[in-house]
Amino acid sequence: MGKAKVPASKRAPSSPVAKPGPVKTLTRKKNKKKKRFWKSKAREVSKKPASGPGAVVRPPKAPEDFSQNWKALQEWLLKQKSQAPEKPLVISQMGSKKKPKIIQQNKKETSPQVKGEEMPAGKDQEASRGSVPSGSKMDRRAPVPRTKASGTEHNKKGTKERTNGDIVPERGDIEHKKRKAKEAAPAPPTEEDIWFDDVDPADIEAAIGPEAAKIARKQLGQSEGSVSLSLVKEQAFGGLTRALALDCEMVGVGPKGEESMAARVSIVNQYGKCVYDKYVKPTEPVTDYRTAVSGIRPENLKQGEELEVVQKEVAEMLKGRILVGHALHNDLKVLFLDHPKKKIRDTQKYKPFKSQVKSGRPSLRLLSEKILGLQVQQAEHCSIQDAQAAMRLYVMVKKEWESMARDRRPLLTAPDHCSDDA
């Protein structure tokens, strides 16, 4: 059987047998249209504002953009002012290291507020970026209101901060002043500084000070309280001895306080040991206690002994013994007592002492300083110390004094009562 032939006019138009010329022209037209479309799209994109991170920010042009940005800035500033007093910062508690941390916290607090107030995309967004940057850019460019933290950020070390009108120096200034004060304070003297010899410690104390005097006394073998220690013989007999030293402290009675009355009576033995010490009740109203010299105060006499009792006790102790003292006629007078002339050893009347200190009526203070090398009666007098000093003077020249007393016994005359107290 033979195959039937299909007519050419009934073929599909899209068959590959179509003419090549017109097909090429169609594809070129389509390509041109595509190129035009993409070019127009690129132009539209270029006209739109850039939103990428590297996009150039342009200033706003429309007046509406200006007004919207101004409102956003005003609202942001009001919120900052309302939040500022909630957390007051104390300048004294802010160190130089803590200040940057506080500023960073303020930045973190402001950034979310600005983010919430971002303007819509497009021209409004362009305007907002031009005047008030949004997001992270706000932290860098926006004018942060001046707070205590930001104000003190620029302060450097050594500057002074002002709080309520008072200038508070920083720690560096205080440490510098303390260092200057320490450098200015003179160092106390040492043993190497006190190198000179044969100088009285009292003179050193007056010239240099008490610290230097202590060192000088230490070098001389003296210590504090050396006056009382040198006048008393340690580990010696503490009872009555052949010689006893007497001294009395007196107060003033009468209209002007010129008359004297016994207020304290002290007796020491030959070794400086105190064997008797009592306050005496006044028989008349005291008009002058003479505290600066006598050391007697009203409370001392309240618990005192009666004068008659003291008289009997002292007379019993002195009976048959050598009585030593300084200006003894005054002490015996206020006690209303008497003692044999040959048994009295008065340091004020001993001629070798007078010639040694070049004084016709030397005081006990002068004799102690020149002969014993001790300072007594510097302030308030003490009857025990005065009796010890008199006994010490007597013991130093006891042999010579007793030999002179034996030689002069046949030539003794009546006692001289005209001498006064030194």
Curated annotation (Swiss-Prot):
Query: What SMART domains is this protein classified in?
Result: EXOIII
Give residue spans, biased composition: Basic and acidic residues.
Answer: 106-127, 151-176
Q: Is Methyltransferase one of the keywords?
A: no
Assigned EC number: 3.1.-.-
Q: Predominant location of this chain?
A: nucleus
Show the cross-link location (Glycyl lysine isopeptide (Lys-Gly) (interchain with G-Cter in SUMO2)). Answer: 115
Q: Which residues carry this modification: Phosphoserine?
A: 15, 96, 111
What does the annotation say about its assembly with partners? Can bind ESR1 and ESR2. This interaction is abrogated by estrogen and augmented by tamoxifen treatment.
What name is this protein filed under? RNA exonuclease 4
This protein's gene is called REXO4
